[in-house]
Curated annotation (Swiss-Prot):
Subunit structure: Forms a heterotetramer with UvrA during the search for lesions. Interacts with UvrC in an incision complex.
Keywords: ATP-binding, Cytoplasm, DNA damage, DNA excision, DNA repair, Excision nuclease, Helicase, Hydrolase, Nucleotide-binding, SOS response
Single GO BP term: nucleotide-excision repair
Comment, domains: The beta-hairpin motif is involved in DNA binding.
Annotated organism of origin: Agathobacter rectalis (strain ATCC 33656 / DSM 3377 / JCM 17463 / KCTC 5835 / VPI 0990)
The protein's name in its UniProt record: UvrABC system protein B
Domain spans labelled Helicase ATP-binding: 24-177
Length: 660
């Protein structure tokens, strides 16, 4: 099936030529290309058009869950007839296994798995197995080890009416796929049996179960049923049941792998005893033998991913299997915000190895556990077929590898890159206060970026004393509160937002008319050309947007950022003049910005009820309501809201236990 792009808009401005250039280059065999798109130029729409034109499976990698969620939502709207999937870390909370030798402290792995994301991850690999028209939006967790695609696909169960297969045989096969039988509580990853009928709730399904009806030792009929109502939706001529976990292996292979694990264990115990490390020898023997026994008995154990090398029969040091291995050979990778995402991919391997090496050295894990890891950067490069970098500020890696660069400088709204002025550091605060007063008198908003937390706090306090409505956005503020602060700025609760490194990607506030950059001439990460261009972009959503840099000299980074902004502005002005376009400030509803926080705020009263004053019955009902809201928030990918509900749920359940 081909990709079918649905949109009420047609490509405009620079989009048509950018799409044409990129598609032509990839069809001619280019491996690396770059889309340089300024803030607000419609890069996501261009990406969608490129995917539709190339018509090949696509992996979009984003540098965080929130942005991945936004892209996932947009791509689902663009491609409603195709498989758009979401693959990020399924942990709401994750404390990795670790050991601190200095204090002899072992920290066991502790995690809370988000059931909804687990389903979406399984759905992504199922879609890649069954069809070609697949877009997977992922975070960098896509480079972490996953089970073998061949094993996962090979163990899947194919069912057809007329197939010779008895009910008990199918039940045993489902257990091998890590499904559990539960005739009372039917949920994702379970099956139930009633006479000659076996119902399966696929691990990658939402609200649809598969009902298999038998006549003797033959499948008589297969239907889809609504889990809630039991209503038959449709009959099926064929269905595939995929494993309930990515770490699924046949019992035969598990038994063989256990023999290899025992060999490695013997070698490790001998090594520790030879080094007179008797505690480590005893520790590794006890822990590993327990895991081996669990795998032989149940086909699974806690931390089974640490034995991935043995379960996949891979050689020491071989690259792990990842989500990328589920894609066919001919596929496209799009790296969103590549100037951040590429370095992030490069940094994953070293941090993971450092922690695991300590566990191995002190007898908590076998050396083979080091192969349960993310890809290193060279291995990641080895899996690239074709790659599109997307960024407003491509970095060194993109510059060195791209064979083609398409620029998207024209905004559909006609908005120009802001004008920039450079002013001396001496007297910068008084000058800034004067500029802030001018902007706020016209009901405009201001962003100020400083270099240090101390300066941000002092500036915020000073302005507040002068009667300016100001708030400070710092790194200790969580995602929900951050969204609320931005909402308050847009709703005119205050006028000036001060921050350090939080004013760059993803902070698009159309009401901003002034961005002030203090100490712009202090070379470093926060004042690099990339950071400066991204910060300048925050003023590009308003037709009156402008930027003031406070500096005593023009650094190389400042010069590049200023020259690039001037170049873009000139191109934009010429285009607007030629086409009779008047720049229009972006109109964006405040509700769009705070969807996450509203999930919690919508029922603030319910959350704030005093559980101590409730009867047992009221408390049980309240718990059920909160649990429902938590699952709904998770289903809508509002994970911060879901976490808030989860914390409330724990508290309420503790209160209920005390009442009992």
């Amino acid at each position: 099936m081909e990709f079918k792009l649905h949109s009420k808009y047609k490509p405009t401005g620079d989009q048509p030529q950018a799409i044409e250039q990129l598609v032509k280059g990839f069809k001619e065999g280019n491996q690396f290309e770059t889309l340089l798109g300024v803030t607000g130029s419609g890069k996501t729409f261009t990406m969608a058009n490129v995917i539709a034109a190339l018509n090949k499976p696509t992996l979009i990698i984003s540098h965080n869950k929130t942005l991945a969620g936004q892209l996932y939502g947009e791509m689902k709207e663009f491609f409603p007839e195709n498989a758009v999937e979401y693959f990020v870390s399924y942990y709401d909370y994750y404390q990795p296994e670790a050991y601190v030798p200095q204090s002899d402290t072992y920290i066991a792995k502790d995690s809370s798995v988000n059931d909804e994301i687990d389903k979406l991850r399984l759905s992504a690999t199922a879609a890649l197995t069954e069809r070609k028209d697949v877009i997977v939006v992922a975070s960098v967790s896509c480079i972490y080890g996953l089970g073998s695609p061949d094993e996962w696909t090979g163990m899947s169960i194919s069912l057809r009416p007329g197939q010779e297969r008895d009910r008990d045989d199918l039940a045993r096969a489902l257990i091998d796929l890590q499904y559990t039988r539960n005739d009372m509580d039917f949920h994702r990853g379970t099956f139930r049996v009633h006479g000659d009928v076996l119902d399966i709730f696929p691990a990658n399904a939402d609200d649809t179960a598969i009902r298999v009806e038998f006549f003797g030792d033959e499948i008589d009929r297969i239907v889809e049923v609504d889990v809630l109502t039991g209503e038959v939706k449709c009959s099926l001529e064929h269905t595939m049941i995929f494993p309930a976990s990515h770490y699924v292996v046949s019992q035969e292979k598990i038994n063989e792998a256990c023999l290899n694990i025992e060999k490695e264990l013997d070698e490790r115990v001998k090594y520790f005893k030879g080094e007179d490390k008797l505690i480590e020898a005893q520790r590794i023997a006890e822990r590993t033998n327990f895991d081996i026994e669990m795998m032989r008995e149940t086909g699974f154990c806690s931390g089974i991913e640490n034995y991935t090398r043995h379960l996949n029969f891979a050689k020491p040091g071989e690259p792990p299997m990842t989500l990328i291995d589920f894609f066919p050979d001919d596929f496209l990778i799009i790296v969103d915000e590549s100037h951040i995402t590429i370095p992030q991919i490069g940094g994953m391997y070293a941090g993971d190895r450092s922690r695991k090496t300590t566990l191995v050295d002190y007898g908590f894990r076998l050396p083979s556990a080091l192969d349960n890891r993310p890809l290193n950067f060279e291995e990641f490069e080895g899996k690239i077929d074709q790659m599109l970098f997307v960024s407003a500020t491509p970095n060194k890696y993109e510059n060195e590898h791209e064979l083609l660069r398409a620029e998207q400088i024209i905004r559909p709204t006609g908005l120009l890159d802001p004008e920039i002025s450079v002013r001396p550091v001496e007297g910068q605060i008084d000058d800034l206060v004067s500029e802030v007063n001018k902007e706020t008198a016209n009901h405009h908003k201001v962003l100020i970026t400083t270099l240090t937390k101390r300066m941000a706090e002092d500036l915020t306090n000073y302005m507040a004393e002068l009667g300016i409505r100001v708030k400070y956005l710092h790194s200790d503020i969580d995602t929900l509160e951050r969204a609320e602060i931005i909402r308050d700025l847009r709703l005119d609760v205050f006028d000036v937002l001060v921050g350090i490194n939080l004013l760059r990607e993803g902070l698009d506030i159309p009401e901003i008319t002034l961005v002030a950059i203090l100490d712009a001439d202090k070379e470093g990460f926060l004042r690099s050309e990339t950071s400066l261009i991204q910060t300048i972009g925050r003023a590009a959503r308003n037709s009156e947007g402008h930027v003031i840099m406070y500096a005593d000299k023009i650094t190389d980074s400042m010069r590049v950022a200023i020259d690039e902004t001037k170049r873009r502005r000139k191109v934009q002005e010429e285009y607007n003049e030629a086409h009779g376009i008047t720049p229009q400030t972006i109109q964006k509803s405040v509700r769009d910005l705070i969807a996450i926080s509203k999930k919690v705020a919508a029922d603030e009263n319910a959350l704030d009820k005093d559980p101590e004053s409730m009867s047992k019955k009221e408390l049980e009902k309240h718990i059920a309501d909160i649990e429902k809201k938590m699952k709904k928030a998770a289903a809508e990918l509002n994970f911060e809201a879901a976490a808030e509900y989860r914390d409330k749920l724990i508290m309420l359940k503790n209160t209920l236990r005390d009442i009992r």
